[in-house]
């Protein structure tokens, strides 16, 4: 049997313990995992207007994800700027991102997320891969990046971050 390949992507805005749990799950199930961070200057500028924090900057997030990925010997990390791939309405167009993901992950056995609603897209974009949903109910780590950004107290946010 050949190597088992996995893929996990996100904005990691900010990187938190739920992301780490998903990455760790992928590393345990696969021989090699590719992690991709999607960045978009326009979206990020809007968020930074209301959350002027170093933890949300592109540079900070890249360092966080690189540090986590370096803990695993068979994991690589890439960045995709999806700003040029936006639709006319300015929204993300995952179908346009798929060929860029394929440049880094030409074959995958598993695609990891914590979002069941991503299943239809993953089935279409990566038909050879099984969608592994990690902690969808967020019982292990009851947190998301959106929830962290909504927290008013910095110490509350920091306890969830990596």
Name each region found by the language model.
Residues 1-162:
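Nucleotidyltransferase catalytic core that binds NTPs
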């Amino acid at each position: 049997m050949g190597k088992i390949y996995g893929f996990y992507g996100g904005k990691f805005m900010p990187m938190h313990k739920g992301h780490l749990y998903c990455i760790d799950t992928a590393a345990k199930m696969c021989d090699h995992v590719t992690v991709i961070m999607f960045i978009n200057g326009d979206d990020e500028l809007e968020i930074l207007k209301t959350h002027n924090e170093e933890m949300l900057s592109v540079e900070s997030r890249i360092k966080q994800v690189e540090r986590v990925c370096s803990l695993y010997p068979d994991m690589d990390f890439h960045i995709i700027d999806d700003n040029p791939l936006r639709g006319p309405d300015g929204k993300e167009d995952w179908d346009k991102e798929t060929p860029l993901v394929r440049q880094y992950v030409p074959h995958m056995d598993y695609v990891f997320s914590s979002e069941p609603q991503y299943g239809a897209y993953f089935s279409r974009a990566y038909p050879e891969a099984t969608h592994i949903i990690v902690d969808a109910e967020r019982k292990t780590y009851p947190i998301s990046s959106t929830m962290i950004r909504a927290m008013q107290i910095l110490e509350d946010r920091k306890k969830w971050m990596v």
